């Protein structure tokens, strides 16, 4: 019995490693995808609605160089977030910019990367914003 459990555990671990690098399934109409993008210096949430409308919630970069960045330090947090969102949007028809951007509050770890996504930088965000 112990040998069977060890074999099963080894198989489960191998399966986890084998599938860990697979990309997420492509967005399909009628489904909502929610992506949490963690950079180690500020996070973002990217949502693709069932109709293909996109929403970015926060785009953080706390600017503290001593904090570890993910996946690495070759780009700033906002650049990594933008790369990820653009990759997801490749599957969406006629989509080159995020439809809506929402900043929950005005702290760097929630909005510090917005300037890295404006038109003229990488052009991911819309040209106009509404502030309440």
Language model segments and positions:
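Positively charged n-region of N-terminal signal peptides that target proteins for export
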Residues: 1-4
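Boundary at the C-terminal end of the N-terminal hydrophobic targeting segment
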Residues: 18-20
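Conserved beta-strand hairpin/beta-sheet module of binuclear metal-dependent hydrolase folds
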Residues: 26-97
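Extracytoplasmic/secreted cell-surface and envelope-processing proteins
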Residues: 64-67, 108-114
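Conserved acidic residues
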Residues: 96-99, 127
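Metallo-beta-lactamase
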Residues: 98-109
